[in-house]
Curated annotation (Swiss-Prot):
PROSITE patterns, alphabetized: AA_TRNA_LIGASE_II (PS50862)
Keyword terms: Aminoacyl-tRNA synthetase, ATP-binding, Cytoplasm, Ligase, Nucleotide-binding, Protein biosynthesis
GO BP terms, alphabetized: selenocysteine biosynthetic process; seryl-tRNA aminoacylation
Binding site for ATP: R261, S262, E263, E348, I349, S350, S351
Protein species of origin: Streptococcus equi subsp. equi (strain 4047)
Annotated protein name in UniProt: Serine--tRNA ligase
Entry-linked SUPFAM superfamilies: Class II aaRS and biotin synthetases, tRNA-binding arm
GO CC terms of this entry: cytoplasm
């Protein structure tokens, strides 16, 4: 959530930055007007409360002196009625302000490229060269079915579209991948967490999913619970409402969890395969950092995600997302896209973001600065390390052989009992 004081004192800068994210200046002008009206009413109510206190003292003195206090009592009753009326106006204005400011996206960092959509993202670098095949390649869904390791037909029967069963060596490959990913992150100083897979609405608000993106989630009717769309939500909210000792920062968390997404608005997109599912595994990275080091931490986090792809020897590229393509809470985002041969393109497999103090303000996550003892908002970061199902898709396609078998990447073989190849059954 943006700082209302910043909007008030640096309106033009905030308006210019949010314009690059598609926010009309008229919305901010309306917000500023409401804020000014609120501040005026607060001054009025404080003045009235001071008058009420004076009237109350005058009534008490009159009663002690056994004098007629009926006029003072009438005056105080009128003051109380006026205060009540202003408080009601303030409540309405506060609700309007909340309704606007909670759906405004974060302001982009100065280094973020300005653009309207994914076409304006900027490629930073590439790693690895896409393999040149001398045979007709198959898509990962065809490979998975032929190898008897992925079953979409029964997933659709048991649940519905965009669900599947991993089976046999497919289940083992998925498990090998997320264990490998977690082990690599632990080497980089991350603490492993197994979080709840359901969170409450306050947690969804804290990380920015609510109220704006409610339609993208699965809520449990009759409860305050939501199935997590990403482990970012429980991991970040771990410190919601807390004040952390500044000496403990930065703090690194990692977790593997299922992610549940309704994929509202994705009808007709990626209807086959592992790219877009309602339920999928993802290894998440979350960091809590001081403002002065958060962008250094973003570079490190992105490098951690790249390291996984490099160890798996999967070609990828890194993009700096433009202002129009970044997520709601992000101030800066790098996307990692892995090469998918059957689609002859790169597809997103990780997104690493610095939200600065945007989530911390919503969730009230603060730290006590050891230098001056003051309590301040920290910066939160999050990134995929990696999306496991998409990594399975990339391995199946990049490591496929002419006979329909798939070679296991060397780094995963210890996690698969030394198995080197998945062969058709």
């Amino acid at each position: 959530m943006l700082d209302l004081k910043r909007i008030r004192t640096d309106f033009d800068t905030v308006a210019a930055k949010l314009k690059t994210r598609g926010v009309s200046e008229a919305i901010l002008t309306s917000l500023k007007a409401l804020d000014e009206q609120r501040r005026t009413l607060l001054v009025q109510t404080e003045e009235l409360k001071a008058q009420r206190n004076i009237a109350s003292a005058a009534i008490a003195q009159a009663k002690r002196q056994k004098e007629d206090a009926s006029q003072q009592i009438a005056d105080m009753q009128q003051l109380a009625a006026n205060i009540k009326a202003i408080d009601a106006k303030l409540a309405d204005i506060d609700q309007e302000i909340t309704g606007i400011i909670t759906v405004l996206p974060n302001t982009p960092h100065d280094s973020v490229p300005i653009g309207a959509d994914e076409e304006d993202n900027v490629e930073i670098h590439r790693w690895g060269k896409p393999r040149q095949f001398d045979f007709d390649i198959k898509a990962h869904w065809d490979l998975g079915e032929a190898l008897d390791i992925l079953d979409w037909e029964r997933g659709a029967k048991v649940t519905g579209a965009r669900f599947l069963f991993y089976k046999n060596l497919g289940a083992r490959l998925e498990r090998a991948l997320y264990n490998f990913m977690l082990d690599e992150h632990l080497k980089e100083g991350y603490q492993e967490i197994i979080p709840p897979y359901m969170v409450n609405h306050d947690s969804m608000f804290g990380t920015g999913q609510y109220p704006k993106f409610k339609e993208d989630t699965f809520e449990l009717d009759g409860t305050n619970f939501v199935l997590i769309p990403t482990a970012e939500v429980p991991l970040t909210n771990y410190y919601r409402g807390d004040i952390i000792d500044g000496k403990e920062l930065p703090i690194y968390f990692t977790a593997m969890s299922p992610s549940f997404r309704s994929e509202a608005g994705s009808a007709g997109r990626d209807t086959r395969g592992l790219i877009r599912l309602h339920q999928f595994h993802k290894v998440e990275m979350v960091k809590f950092a001081k403002p002065e080091t958060s962008y250094e931490e973003l570079e490190k986090m992105t490098a951690n995600a790249e390291h996984i792809l490099q160890k798996l020897k999967l070609p990828y590229r890194v993009l700096a997302l433009c202002t129009g393509d970044m997520g709601f809470s992000a101030a800066k985002t790098y996307d990692l896209e892995v090469w998918i041969p059957a689609q002859n393109t790169y597809r997103e497999i990780s997104s690493c973001s610095n939200t600065e103090d945007f989530q911390a303000r919503r969730a009230q996550i603060r730290y006590r600065d050891e230098a001056d003892g003051k309590v301040k908002l920290l910066h939160t970061l999050n990134g995929s390390g990696l999306a496991v199902g998409r990594t399975v898709a990339a391995i199946l396609e990049n490591y496929q052989n002419e006979d329909g078998s798939v070679t296991i990447p060397e780094v995963l073989r210890p996690y698969m009992g030394g198995l080197e190849v998945i062969k058709p059954r």
